[in-house]
C-alpha cells in the first residue's frame, strides 16, 4: 500500500518535517491573526492610506520561541513606546530554548524582537493618528508593515527558569516572541541619529 499523501501545511500547526529537512522533527508554521484584514483589504483605511496586494507566498518561516505577557489586552491600552512605562512584563520562553539563556543573566539591557500578530500587513502609505501628513510605512515605527516585526530595548530585571522579567515593552498580552539579543551600548547606540520629518514636526 502506498503511503498517504502529506497534508498541506496548516498555519499555526506543529508539522512533521519533510524528508531531509535539516530543521528537526517539527516545523512551526506562522499563523495569521484572527482579526487580521485580508490581503489588499480596503476596509479600515484612513484618508490617504494605500494598501497593496501581498505576495502569494512567504520567502522564509519563523520559529516563535515564546510569548510575551503584559497587562495590555488591546492596542489602545498599550503605551506608545516602551519608554513610557515602568510595567514589569514577563517573557515566557519555550522550554526547548531555555539553554540558550546561559550568560544572559549578566546583561543589564537586551533587545527583544517580537511579532505584532494583530497588525495588518498590506499598507505602504499610512496616516497615523498623531501625524498630520501621510508617511511611507518604512519611514514609520508603526506595527503595520509587510513583516510586523517590532524591536524594543528592555531593562532585564531577573531570570527565573525560562521566564524573563523586563521593563520597556509596549505590546499586547500573548504577543509571539521572535528573538532575544544582548544590547551593546558601544555598537547599538547612535547618539547623533535623526529623523528629519519628526524633528521638523516638533519645531
Task: Give each language-model segment a name.
Residues 3-8, 13, 66, 150-152:
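Small-side-chain structural scaffolding
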Residues 30-153, 157-203:
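Glycine-rich, low-complexity intrinsically disordered segments
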Residues 1-3, 9, 15-28:
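Intrinsically disordered, low-complexity serine/threonine-rich segments
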